[in-house]
């Protein structure tokens, strides 16, 4: 632990002791213990790095007792929040939309961004050397698609294309289903496909940021940037939010929002413990920011409840 983080931990403990005395606001008494749900990383069991420091930091922010609840998967996390066993949950975009569909009782509070300003992803259909001229020509070409559980490479494009009246059946003869996203990319590189579905990271205004996405990996595999063309691009799918129950007291929301949106600038080591994948900090978000995720969940539900 860095010296700055140790110093912050000491201040948090001292300040928490001062804040959390017997005189509490009614909303704190009503809640009793504020519970935060999180899904552990694969193979981590019930362990969360820096759990003690994170717990004390949220305790300090809210001025009340806080506990972290580690769920085995998103389905368990959703049930816990829907049944009011936790007040706060850290979701993927589609898990949040599933929770909203399940109970209508959750609202997004903040979501992470990348250091370069990317706030989510957009699906893309990429071709090489102009082989695919447009969506209308797909039926006469070979189109690689990642597996059905790939959000950016399968679920998002299927949902968006259906909304654009260019619906693709999952068993369409021109689709080549790949076992992984990497396998779909290899098909394009090796010439076994004329185009592939994939994704790019995108900023809030929707402009694509290609680093780290499918096009960047294709270029790393040897394709020239000038040989790749984007045939189609979806709307923005935001990174998953930190969500609270809709009945959470406004003062608790305010305290959490102030704490989270300032966390990266005030205590970056603590931010990295809470959010390890997107290093740019937290921004406030609203339900409308997850309209795309909700549409994906509706598609999955209509298609037989595939999770």
Where are these regions (language model features)?
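A bilobed periplasmic-binding-protein/Venus flytrap-type ligand-binding module shared by bacterial periplasmic
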Residues: 39-40, 122-132, 234-251
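Bilobed "Venus flytrap"/periplasmic-binding protein-like clamshell domains
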Residues: 31, 35-59, 94, 118-186, ...
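Pocket-lining segment of extracytoplasmic ligand-binding domains
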Residues: 142-249
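Sec/Tat signal peptide C-region and signal peptidase I cleavage site
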Residues: 21-25
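An extracytoplasmic/periplasmic, membrane-proximal ligand-sensing/linker region
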Residues: 27-53, 244-307
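A structural signal for short loop-to-beta-strand junctions that line the ligand-binding cleft
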Residues: 105-118, 227-233
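Beta->alpha turn/N-cap motifs
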Residues: 38-40, 70-74, 84-102, 111-112, ...
């Amino acid at each position: 632990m860095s010296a700055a983080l140790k110093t912050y931990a000491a201040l948090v403990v001292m300040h928490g002791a001062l804040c959390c005395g017997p005189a509490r606001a009614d909303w704190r008494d009503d809640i009793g213990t504020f519970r935060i749900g999180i899904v552990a990383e694969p193979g981590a069991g019930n362990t969360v790095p820096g759990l003690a420091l994170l717990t004390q930091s949220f305790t300090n922010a809210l001025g009340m007792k806080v506990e972290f609840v580690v769920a085995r998967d998103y389905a368990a996390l959703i049930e816990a929040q829907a049944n009011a066993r936790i007040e706060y949950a850290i979701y993927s975009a589609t898990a949040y939309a599933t929770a909203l569909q399940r109970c209508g009782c959750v609202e997004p509070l903040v979501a992470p961004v990348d250091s370069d300003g990317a706030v989510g992803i957009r699906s893309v259909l990429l071709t090489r050397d102009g082989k695919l001229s447009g969506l209308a020509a797909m039926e006469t070409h070979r189109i690689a698609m990642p597996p059905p559980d790939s959000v950016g490479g399968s679920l998002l494009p299927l949902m968006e294309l259906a909304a654009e009246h260019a619906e693709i059946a999952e068993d369409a003869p021109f689709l080549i289903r790949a076992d992984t996203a990497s396998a779909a990319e290899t098909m394009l590189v090796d010439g076994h496909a004329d185009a592939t579905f994939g994704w790019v990271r995108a900023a809030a205004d929707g402009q694509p940021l290609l680093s780290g996405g499918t096009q960047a990996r294709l270029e790393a595999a040897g394709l020239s940037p000038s040989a790749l063309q984007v045939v189609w691009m979806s709307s923005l799918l935001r990174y998953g939010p930190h969500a609270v129950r809709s009945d959470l007291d406004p003062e608790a929301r305010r305290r959490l929002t102030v704490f989270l949106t300032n966390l990266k600038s005030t205590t970056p080591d603590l931010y990295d413990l809470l959010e390890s994948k997107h290093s740019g900090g937290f921004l406030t978000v609203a339900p409308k920011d997850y309209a795309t995720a909700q549409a994906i969940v509706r598609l999955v539900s209509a298609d037989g409840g595939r999770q």
